[in-house]
Structure formats: structure tokens, C-alpha cells
Amino acid sequence: MLFRSQATFRIVNYPKFFTPNGDGYNDTWNISEIASDQPEAYIYIFDRYGKLLKQISVIGEGWDGTLNGLTLPSTDYWFRVFYKENGESKEFKSHFSLKR
């Protein structure tokens, strides 16, 4: 008999806020903790109206809170993470806050 173990991947720990003020702490937003398990995962970041602001990779530096070089306001932003689990495409959605 052959038993296959299938690992389930969950995104439970992501930054709930970031503070892009140039102090070197929490200046960018990303879910880099999943990079070791999901290096090909990517993230779309949206404003409250659903406008796409940025696409980032989990292995990149993250989002700095700007759009076309302009700083965006302190508010909530939404994201969608696309990744693979057991060869199947999956999606995770949630939100975070930008605080200035």
C-alpha cells in the first residue's frame, strides 16, 4: 500500500500594517515568510475601490506605499496572493493598513 502525504499551505501570518517613513523599520510591505515554501507566489495590492496599485513577488523587497512615485495616504489596502498547493492554483485575500 502506498500512502501519499499532502501538505496544506496556509497564509496565517502576514503584516497587518506597515509604516513607510524611512526609519528602516516596516518601511515596505510583503509576505516574505512564505518565500521558502512558495517562491513563485505573487501578490496584487489594491486600493479600496479595487484599483490595482502594485504586483509584487514574495521574494522581492515589497511595496513602499507609492504609486508612480507618489506617496499614497494612510488607509487600508487589500491584497490577493496567488500560489500553488499540491499543483493546484490557490488564492488568499485579506487587507492591511498603511500608517504614515
Where are these regions (language model features)?
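Short, small-residue-biased leader/transition segments that mark boundaries at the very start
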Residues: 1-2
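Short loop/turn motifs at secondary-structure boundaries
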Residues: 5-100
